[in-house]
Swiss-Prot record:
One of its GO terms (biological process) is DNA metabolic process. CDD domains: Orn. The gene is orn. Belongs to the oligoribonuclease family. Gene3D superfamilies: Ribonuclease H-like superfamily/Ribonuclease H (3.30.420.10). This is Oligoribonuclease. SUPFAM superfamilies: Ribonuclease H-like. GO terms for molecular function: 3'-5'-RNA exonuclease activity; nucleic acid binding.
Amino acid sequence: MQNKQNLIWIDLEMTGLDPDTDVIIEMATIITDSELNTLAEGPVIAVHQSDETLAKMDEWNTRQHGGSGLTQRVRESTISMAEAEAQTLEFIKLWVPERSSPICGNSICQDRRFLYRHMPTLENWFHYRNLDVSTLKELAARWSPELKFKKGSTHLALDDIRESIAELRFYREHFIKP
């Protein structure tokens, strides 16, 4: 099953944007082949956080994660940050050798900052390169502004990854010239 051409897609939901003061509350992973065909979906994990930690979320995060049901899932979860890291790493080891896949997603540098701070063993599994779909989004907005990819906005980790993969397929078809 392991293949160094496979890609690891990851998305995190956090209590905010600062990895020094905010924490991960949900994570999900998907493995695709190099042609962006989904091979496997990993665990979708709500990471337990205390009510005190959740109370520190700003208005946007409180509204978004409360409305999606994520805040309640986080409260009810018994999975620690370390357990979430271990479960995710166990899954990706089945599919991708160490340091062969870039970390893939949308605005993935932000997720990588949180992994570096809170899940360093998992972060170290990735190649040092990033496959960031938002780079193509920014280029298309400037060079081909007529191209628009319509995104949803659930801000749930697995939905966000599926959307990122679909968005990259869209840019491959409509923006990247062979």
